[in-house]
């Protein structure tokens, strides 16, 4: 089982989480590297770094479990290079499109779930047998936390899923 990219991204996320919460001030770290209005003032690195910042231990654990579960399937299918391109480029596009929401809200977007949603969308497109289940999963993950009062970037999940689905539909990486 060669999951070179998936395992590397998981390791990087946990290393950054450790730095964020145990080495640096987590609030300042999150603001500096999360995606927020500072992006419009020149903090352009945020579009990349926000994919590696997480709001809590449960946030990173849930993201990394889902990344491992679906990343292991797609990395085997695509190979690590194409999988890496899908994850990173899909995450960047999701971040850029999510910037539109920042115009209306003062928020700080953090987490890997936008890029992970790209993977789910891609998989839903190429795997017609599991398509309905994956759509249900993304809807639950996007909206159930809101019903419990948990702040979730539901739009990033839906945007990412759509980007991934389109990438699969147009056979961008095959």
Protein language model annotation of sequence segments:
Residues 1-174:
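A detector for small-residue-rich transmembrane helices and their helix-helix packing motifs
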């Amino acid at each position: 089982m060669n999951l070179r990219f998936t395992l590397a991204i998981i390791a990087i996320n946990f290393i950054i989480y450790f730095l964020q919460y145990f080495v640096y001030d987590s609030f300042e770290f999150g603001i500096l590297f999360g995606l927020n209005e500072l992006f419009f003032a020149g903090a352009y690195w945020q579009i990349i770094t926000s994919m590696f910042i997480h709001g809590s231990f449960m946030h990173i654990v849930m993201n990394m479990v889902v990344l491992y579960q679906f990343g292991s399937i797609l990395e085997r299918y695509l190979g690590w290079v194409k999988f890496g391109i899908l994850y990173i480029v899909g995450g960047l596009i999701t971040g850029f499109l999510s910037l539109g929401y920042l115009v209306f809200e003062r928020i700080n977007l953090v987490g890997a779930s936008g890029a992970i949603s790209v993977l789910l969308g891609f998989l839903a497109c190429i795997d017609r047998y599991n398509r309905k289940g994956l759509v249900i999963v993304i809807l639950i993950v996007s909206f159930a936390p809101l019903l419990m009062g948990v702040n979730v970037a539901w739009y990033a999940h839906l945007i990412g899923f759509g980007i991934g689905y389109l990438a699969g539909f147009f056979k961008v990486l095959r």
